[in-house]
Regions:
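Conserved PLP-enzyme active-site core in the AAT-like
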Residues: 1-216
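Conserved C-terminal alpha-helix-loop-beta "cap" of PLP-dependent enzymes
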Residues: 200, 215, 219-294
Length: 294
């Protein structure tokens, strides 16, 4: 996307992502239209000829209502609009490519790294999206790129398959924006991948037990965990989360925001820090930290 374009995104996002979309992208002239993913048709309703992508988080923090991946992907593909999903919170337990997502992103700092030791992120192109089919929808990939000798990315990669997006991201965007991972961080993430499946299994098992306990606690107003939801939220969790429900949950204690702060400050065994997917048990109060600016 560039100045004058727009992205339609789920309104259920991590606070840092929402802030970037709402403010940083706005300063760049890119409009992000936030919609309620409860009804996938909201994505279609917010789309126009300048829409370049749909975006959502598989397990958004802190609502943890699973994103309707296939429903939104099916709206976008006939229009030439790729679905980009953040699967940071659900590696292994959800496979968005199986449900039509075109691109997956991860903050590798979280579950992939697994120990809170390194900062990084990855973009994964499915190779199943036809970036050439709607050239007017993806002009950056279908017109000469002056920053790379006039290359037309969809033409340049034809012998390799439909990888125009990821090749441009790797060749020019990474070059120009500078988000280069250090070799040592990459090594740490590769190590983390070796035990990722095992850790996600245990994260899910432990979280399920905690959610069950909290659901019956007198001081808890509500628990947000995929297996403990009702209606469409539970249906989507059952559809998309095939190997556990993840290691994250949200819950509300009775007494409002001040009671939440008091609870967090009283924790002794559980760490009060923001990083998820760590080797430690963590808790945070979103209203006064990660989502305080929303």
């Amino acid at each position: 996307a560039k100045n004058g374009d727009n992205i339609v995104a789920s309104a259920h996002l991590y606070g840092g992502t929402y802030n970037q979309f709402k403010n940083v992208f706005s300063d760049m002239g890119i409009e992000v239209r936030f919609v309620d993913p409860a009804d996938p048709q909201n994505f279609a309703n917010a789309t126009d000829d300048k829409t370049r992508a749909y975006y959502g988080e598989v397990l958004p923090n802190p609502s943890f209502e699973v994103f309707p991946i296939s429903e939104v992907a099916e709206i976008g593909r006939p229009l030439g609009i790729p679905l980009i999903v953040d699967n940071t919170a659900a590696p292994v337990i959800c496979k968005p490519f199986d449900h039509g997502a075109a691109v997956i992103i991860h903050s590798t700092t979280k579950f992939i790294g697994g120990h809170g030791t390194s900062i990084g992120g990855i973009i994964v192109d499915s190779g199943n999206f036809d970036w050439e089919a709607f050239p007017e929808r993806q002009p950056a990939l279908n017109t000469p790129d002056p920053s790379y000798g006039g290359a037309i990315w969809t033409e340049a990669v034809k012998p390799l398959g439909p990888i125009a997006y990821i090749l441009k991201a790797r060749t020019t965007i990474l070059r120009d924006m500078g988000a280069a991972m250090s070799p040592f961080n990459a090594f740490m993430f590769i190590q983390g991948l070796e035990t990722l499946a095992l850790r996600m299994r245990e994260h899910s098992s432990n979280a399920e037990k905690v959610a069950k306990y909290l659901s019956s606690h007198d001081s808890v107003e509500r628990v947000s965990y995929p297996s403990h939801m009702d209606g469409y939220a539970k249906e989507r969790a059952d559809k998309y989360l095939t190997k556990g429900n993840g290691g994250l949950m949200g819950f509300e204690v009775k007494g409002g925001i001040e009671a939440g702060k008091k609870f967090i400050n009283a924790l002794e065994m559980v760490y009060h820090v923001a990083n998820i997917g760590d080797s430690r048990s963590l808790a945070i109060h979103p209203g006064s930290t990660t989502h305080s600016q929303l």
